[in-house]
A protein has these predicted regions:
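A short, conserved, highly charged catalytic patch centered on acidic carboxylates
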Residues: 2-124, 130-151
């Protein structure tokens, strides 16, 4: 069920030069403009920041409609979706699951996003490791792979 499409991933790129980074307590950190705080620059965070840059800079999603590390209750457990995008009415529209570039996007990653969907009904699921992106439309319990980014 995983169908990759090469989309605007070139804007995700390999460089972090458009991001504000520094060393804090001997560890690299990046300033997240959406959360308005410095966060540890892990490989997954690097992909998350690139995806946020793509969403706001290229896709023109309003920053105020994006939540980062959004808490979702799944089977009485509190989980965190990497990115949730809302519509203008405040309704969740998409869950984006980010993985480090070295982590392949597999059915296991899709299963994780589906679990998050069970706690937060959205129209779309997106999976990315910064090199590949997979998008799905979820409707009436059916998941359809898309060939382009839906927003």
């Amino acid at each position: 069920m995983l169908i990759a499409f090469q989309t605007i991933i070139h804007t995700l790129g390999n460089k972090m030069d458009w991001f504000k980074t520094q060393i804090l307590n001997d560890k690299p950190v990046v300033f997240d403009p959406l959360r308005r705080q410095w966060v540890s620059l892990t490989p997954e965070e690097q992909v998350r920041q690139k995806m946020l840059h793509y969403l706001v800079g290229t896709r023109k999603v309003a920053a105020g409609l994006i939540a980062v590390e959004y808490s979702i209750k799944v089977n009485n457990l509190l989980k965190r979706a990497d990115i949730v995008i809302f519509n203008n009415l405040g309704e969740p529209q998409m869950i984006v699951e980010c993985k480090a570039e070295t982590v392949p996007i597999t059915e296991k990653v899709l299963d994780q996003a589906i679990r998050y969907y069970s706690g937060l009904k959205v129209k779309y699921l997106t999976l990315t490791n910064g090199k590949s992106m997979f998008c799905y439309k979820v409707e009436e319990g059916k998941i359809e792979a898309l060939t382009e980014f839906p927003l």
